[in-house]
Every structure is written in C-alpha cells, then in structure tokens.
C-alpha cells in the first residue's frame, strides 16, 4: 500500500515485454525492493491472483488454528510463537498475525484498520476462481477461502483488513 511505496518495500509482479520492464524498472525500484517479471502481458495478474489465493488460504487457516487454541485455553501469543517456529510457520505468523494484541504493527492490533481490504481479497479470489474455471484447474482450498471471505464481507467487514477473518472464527 501507500506505506510500502513510501518505504520502498513493495513487491511488484510484472507482465509484459522485456523492453517495457527495462523502461518501468527505475520507477518500480523507487517504490519496491522485489520486482518479478512473470512473463508476457497478463502474467503479472495471474501471478498476483495465485499469490493472493494462497495468502487467503494461509490467513484463514492461521486464524482458525489460533481460535481453536484460544478456545482451548492457550495464550494466542504463545501459540503464535509455537506455530511460527514449527511446521505451521507462515507469513501471517511472521509479520501479519490476525489475532488482536499479538503483533503490534499488524492491522489486528489496530482494529483491523489499514492494510488489504476484505473486499479486495474477495475481488482477487473471484478472479482466481474465474481463471480456474477457464483452465479447468481444481482449486478447492481457494474456493473454500473465497466462501469464507464472502461470508465475512457479508457480515459487514468488507472495508477492513483481510486478517479480520479472525472475527469469523471468534465466539462473542
């Protein structure tokens, strides 16, 4: 987002000709640290929706596991550290924990304000599902994650960060 661009930490996934990438590289390097050339025009979009589909699966699975632990009496910070250092370790546990109060810079500790909106995740998951349909690719995990995010958005959380999927699993 804006903070990433200002800090020069964005990741760019680019599709297009080598010549176009050479021309765009100085601008991209001013805002990002990772620039990937995915292939021809359109390849960057495909790579992005694949990445975001995986991210939605990881985030919803992380939120579900954290809630199971909390509901069984575990401290979410302790469980997060155990999973982070074990085979369940993933990006959400490393830098974007969905459980409030576990990771101060994460949106979960700011009432899920800022970050990547649920509505945008739903859009990208819709694009991923359309691509899967076009290619005949089985995406049962992506489809389930999309259903979870659509339900979460329908519950009024479309305009907050996608890590707020944690709320879908919480008992009030």
Annotated model-derived regions:
Residues 1-52:
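Rossmann-fold dinucleotide-binding core
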Residues 43-144, 148-172:
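Helical "substrate-binding/catalytic lid" subdomain
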